Amino acid sequence: MVIYHAIKGVDEAGNPDQTSGELVRLIGENCHTVVADNEIAERYSRHLKKLLSIPSLLYKTTDFLSEVIYNSSKFVVEECPAPELPPGVRVPREDEYIVRAALISHPIIVTAEDRVLKAVSRESVLALIALTPAEALELAKDT
């Protein structure tokens, strides 16, 4: 989860890396928005509650909550239910909720999960774009 990586200051392998943190900072500063459906918003909430219980991450987590999650211009929860995947589309079962949520309004999916990146790029019928945090950071810098 990119937000988890941003707050902890690590990459998907747990190595020190500020890419996700820089991306979240840019989202907070410019016109970009985090879009989620109810399921993703609930998962964010659970992860953030865990991070709030870690004293060394309290400041970064609280900052993220105030800059993004509690800011209605930066965090939008789509209320309509996520559609089913089109027939024949294959994505890893554990990541299906991410792809289905993106089918609501077609935001850019930002993920460090290689399996999600590959599935989205392989299934062109979805008409979705998935980027790594580093790719999204470059895009955020340009806009």
What are these regions (language model features)?
Residues 1-36:
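Short, well-structured N-terminal submotif of metal-dependent ribonuclease cores
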Residues 6-8, 44-48, 120-122:
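A short acidic (Asp/Glu
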Residues 2, 40, 97-98, 115-117:
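Alpha-helix capping/helix-boundary segments
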Residues 70-108, 119-121:
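Active-site neighborhoods of divalent-metal-dependent phosphate/nucleic-acid chemistry enzymes
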Residues 25-31, 38-84:
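PIN-domain endoribonuclease scaffold, especially VapC-family toxins
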Residues 103, 108, 114-143:
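Acidic, PIN/NYN-like endoribonuclease modules and their adjacent C-terminal/linker elements
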